[in-house]
A protein has these predicted regions:
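Hydrophobic/aromatic residues within transmembrane alpha-helices
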Residues: 31, 38, 42, 89, ...
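Membrane-interface helix termini and inter-helical loops of multi-pass transporters
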Residues: 26-34, 91, 137-151, 195-214, ...
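Loop-to-transmembrane-helix transition segments
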Residues: 9-19, 60-85, 127, 150-159, ...
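Specific alpha-helical transmembrane segments that line the substrate/conduction pathway
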Residues: 37, 44-48, 87-118, 159, ...
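Transmembrane alpha-helices of multi-pass small-molecule transport proteins
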Residues: 33-81, 106-109, 162-169, 183-201, ...
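Glycine-/small-residue-enriched transmembrane alpha-helix faces in small-molecule transporters
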Residues: 1-40, 44-46, 77, 85, ...
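Helix-helix packing/entry segments at the starts of transmembrane helices
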Residues: 98-104, 170-189, 221-257
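Hydrophobic transmembrane alpha-helices of multi-pass small-molecule transport proteins
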Residues: 50, 54, 73, 121-141, ...
Length: 296
């Protein structure tokens, strides 16, 4: 396959992966279970599928170093809390609002990463942080946690903080493993973390709900991670980051088409501000990582 053909294939895989990632939000509304129970069953199914993918691709399930199991445990705990808060945010508010609140994470990454790397924080990053804060404020209907939408926004921001922490820790300590290996351990640990807290009665779950759970665990969890990993072979990190910023748009469009969710003007403006800032920071971060041709 030519380089142009590889890039086209990678871009198709990437957009499909981001579309599927955006589609996960719909299941917070479609599956009649709590956020914790949805996450638990999602992780059970995804862990099984990911283990099979690792074996079929002839990779090792065993980790290289003993200390990596402790890192996998920490990452799994963070992922379990991230996914529970991710679904809870949308159950409390709406798919669009929950996803916009969650998508504050690219700017959070820019603001928090210097603490991990010792790099300098730029003025533009602080301005981006203020822009995202303004965007989130526009989403809030009233400054009271008694309002479910306001609470959902707060929970979505907590989910973004957890996701940011997971990404930074993974980047620093767990990059020796493929996406399938890493996600297998994170979903498997999440099952162990969440299992004691579930309120499931398996016998009461309908066949339709089981079908939705299988769809979520296989098509909307394992498959997009595999597609995303494949796309990384053909595309630059900048392209991947910029396309990933379309996730809230895809999620909101799917919610509008399939769930008949509508956007208020304030939500549309706030969401545009958050996503535009995420796009800007993603673009700038990759520019800063590029080799400098002329420093004079």
């Amino acid at each position: 396959m030519s380089a142009k053909g590889q890039a086209r294939t990678g871009l198709t895989e990437l957009h499909l992966a981001v579309l599927l990632f955006g589609g996960t939000a719909l299941f917070s509304r479609l599956i009649p279970l709590s956020a914790l129970d949805i996450t638990l069953l999602r992780c059970v199914i995804a862990a099984i599928v990911l283990a099979l993918l690792v074996k079929l691709s002839r990779q090792r399930l065993r980790l290289l170093r003993g200390k990596d199991y402790l890192i996998a445990l920490l990452l799994g705990v963070i992922v379990s809390l991230h996914w529970v808060t991710y679904f809870a945010a949308m159950q409390l508010s709406s798919v669009a609002i929950g996803m916009i609140a969650f998508f504050t994470y690219p700017v959070m990454t820019v603001l928090i990463e210097p603490w991990f790397t010792g790099s300098r924080l730029h003025l533009r990053d602080l301005v981006s942080g203020l822009a995202v804060l303004l965007g989130v404020i526009l989403l809030i209907p009233e400054p009271s946690l008694g309002n479910d939408v306001t609470l959902g926004i707060l929970v979505g921001v907590v989910s973004a903080i957890l996701f940011t922490a997971r990404n930074l820790l993974h980047k620093r300590y767990f990059t020796a493993y493929s996406g399938q290996q890493a996600m297998f351990y994170q979903t498997a640990v999440a099952v162990l973390v969440l299992a004691p807290w579930h309120s499931l009665d398996v016998g009461d779950i309908s066949n339709q709900t089981w079908g939705l759970l299988l769809l979520l665990g296989i098509v909307f969890t394992a498959a997009p991670h595999a597609l995303f990993t494949s796309a990384l072979r053909y595309l630059s990190a900048k392209t991947v980051g910029l396309v990933a910023c379309l996730q809230p748009f895809y999620g909101a469009m799917l919610a509008w088409l399939l769930l008949d969710e509508s956007l208020t003007l304030a939500t549309a403006i706030g969401g545009t501000l958050v996503v535009a800032t995420a796009l800007f920071e993603t673009s700038q971060s990759h520019k800063s990582q590029a080799p400098k041709k002329n420093l004079g």
